Amino acid sequence: MEIYNGRPEKSDGRLLREVRTYDFLDDLGIEYKRTDHEPANNMEACNEIDAVLGVLICKNLFLCNRQKTNFYLLMMPGDKKFKTKELSAQINSARLSFADPEDMLKYLDIEPGAVSIMGLMNDKDHAVQLLIDEDVLAGEELGCHPCVCTSSLKMKTADVINKFLPATGHGYRTVHLVGED
C-alpha cells in the first residue's frame, strides 16, 4: 500500500460518493493522506491500514432507536469494545441497535463496511446525530473511509471538528465509552 497526498489524480473507476468526498474536503482546504486497498469492511481488515497510515482507523457504527426515529453515528477507537447498554445510558435513549443498510444509504449515502463521518456531508436534513468517544477527540489525527471501503484517509482531528462538521451543519456530542463488562 502506498500513501498519497490528497485525492487521486484520476477518478476513473471510483464511485461518485468517493469523488464527492474529495471535492468536499478540497473545497474546505482540509489536507489529508490517502491509501487505496482491498475492501476493508471490518476492524480486523483495518489493522494493516492503521500501520500504513500511522493512525488508528475509527470504528464507526450507525445506530438507531427501536422506533427508528433517532439515528446516531458513533465514532470510537477501533480497539475499544462497543456496549449498547453503556452508550444508551449516556445518551438517555432506550434500546439502540444497528440501523438497516437502507437507512445508511438513505441518510449517509454509504453502504455497510464504509460507514464514516464523511457520510455526514450527505445528511442534508441533519437526521443523524454524531457521537464521538473522547479518546477519538484526544487524538491529533484520525482515520476514516471516504464513503467507500477501498480507500482510507488520515487527517487532523481539529480539521474534522472545526472545518468539516460546521460545513455539514452537524455538531457532535462527546461520550465516554469504557467498553468493559
Predicted features and spans:
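Extended, low-hydrophobicity, polar/charged segments
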Residues: M1-D181
